[in-house]
């Protein structure tokens, strides 16, 4: 399975290598390695490939394996002979140990062949993959460099002590309330069959918003851009939301068609901003996604398990009447609103 790399992510400022690192964190062997160390390992591997060491090392390994088999077969044929004192000294160290010198029947010590000097290291401390064990990493046609088509040998990645930002895997769960600037990882499950291509495209187009706090009719909103959407090996969806601009907004409530009311705005904590007949509306993401065929399994790092009541149809509707952008680019937020035209311009911005 290849990393989800495409021109779309590159247009948003995300490099193909960064996409591969994110994919490794989510779908790899749960190795905690920062992007800087991952990039250094990639560049070192790329340098080896460009130097042409790949084929040469494979040929050397094949020659060493053949010589080792020949040597072991000769040793078995001579096993009936009485071992000398020099052989007794190292016999208990294992059948793969090769001494610095061996004794023939005449008692003369002869040096071992040169090819035996690296046997212990290559057997007990493997540093490379065999060709059949390598996993190809295709970074996409837009980076059609000859080294990209060759198999990677990064199976031996080791964890680093650097901080991982963003926390993308299930073992990176926060025990305290995270800061608003951290990304969010959604795990979605389908409760009816969905077309994979259509579902991925639809999730990419959604405008997620975090409701950070609210006092009476005033609230703080944080827009969350969809970085990528991937289909996991267990047939779930993972959606990475990257924090964007901060808004100070005013909202109003409208009585809905259902009799079930929420005493708080918790169901709107993660919302999707949509255009409706009454203006810009905040829809609870759990309820809206449920109606589209998705069930939110987890909402990291905020919630490991989503409350069941958040998927219920709310008894009221929330509409944004005005919003002021805080500490970000005005034109960026304006483009966000331009993509959601409303019949009634209820949403105004103050640059």
Curated annotation (Swiss-Prot):
Domain of life: Eukaryota
Segments for region (Important for interaction with piRNA): 117-164
Induction description: Expression is down-regulated by DAZL protein, which binds to 3'UTR of Tex19.1 mRNAs and probably represses its translation.
Compositionally skewed regions (Acidic residues) per UniProt: 55-85
Summary of the tissues where the protein is detected: Expressed in testis, placenta and ovary. Expressed in pluripotent stem cells. In testis, expression is highest in mitotic spermatogonia, decreases as spermatocytes progress through meiosis, and is present at low levels in round spermatids (at protein level).
Source species of the chain: Mus musculus (Mouse)
The protein's name: Testis-expressed protein 19.1
Any Pfam family the entry gives: TEX19
A GO BP entry: spongiotrophoblast cell proliferation
Residue ranges, annotated region (Disordered): 55-90
């Amino acid at each position: 399975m290849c990393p989800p790399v495409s021109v779309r992510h590159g247009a948003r400022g995300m490099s193909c290598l960064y996409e591969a690192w994110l994919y490794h964190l989510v779908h790899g062997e749960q190795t905690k390695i920062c992007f800087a160390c991952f990039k250094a390992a990639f560049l070192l591997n790329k340098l080896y490939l460009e130097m042409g060491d790949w084929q040469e090392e494979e040929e050397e390994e094949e020659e060493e394996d053949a010589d080792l088999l020949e040597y072991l077969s000769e040793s078995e044929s001579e096993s009936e002979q009485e071992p000398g004192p020099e052989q007794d000294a190292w016999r208990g160290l294992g059948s793969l140990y090769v001494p610095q010198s061996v004794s023939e029947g005449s008692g003369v010590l002869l040096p071992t062949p040169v090819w035996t000097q690296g046997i212990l290291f290559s057997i007990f401390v493997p540093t490379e993959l065999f060709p059949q064990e390598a996993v190809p990493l295709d970074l996409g046609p837009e980076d059609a460099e000859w080294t990209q088509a060759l198999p990677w040998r990064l199976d031996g990645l080791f964890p680093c002590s650097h901080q991982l930002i963003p926390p993308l895997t299930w073992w990176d769960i926060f025990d305290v309330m995270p800061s608003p600037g951290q990304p969010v990882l959604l795990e979605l499950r389908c409760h009816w069959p969905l077309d994979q291509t259509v579902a991925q495209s639809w999730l990419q187009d959604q405008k997620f918003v975090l409701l950070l706090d609210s006092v009476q009719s005033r609230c703080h909103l944080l827009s969350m851009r969809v970085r990528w959407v991937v289909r996991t090996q267990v047939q779930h969806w993972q959606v990475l939301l990257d924090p964007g601009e901060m808004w100070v907004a005013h909202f109003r409530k409208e009585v809905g068609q259902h009799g079930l009311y929420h005493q708080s705005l918790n169901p709107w904590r993660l919302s999707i901003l949509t255009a409706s007949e009454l203006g810009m509306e905040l829809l609870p993401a759990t309820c809206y996604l449920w109606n589209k065929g998705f069930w939110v399994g987890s909402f990291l790092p905020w919630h490991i398990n989503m409350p069941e009541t958040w998927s219920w149809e709310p008894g009221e509707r929330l509409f944004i009447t005005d919003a002021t952008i805080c500490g970000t680019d005005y034109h960026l937020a304006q483009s966000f609103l331009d993509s959601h035209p409303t019949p009634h311009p209820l949403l105004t911005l103050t640059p």
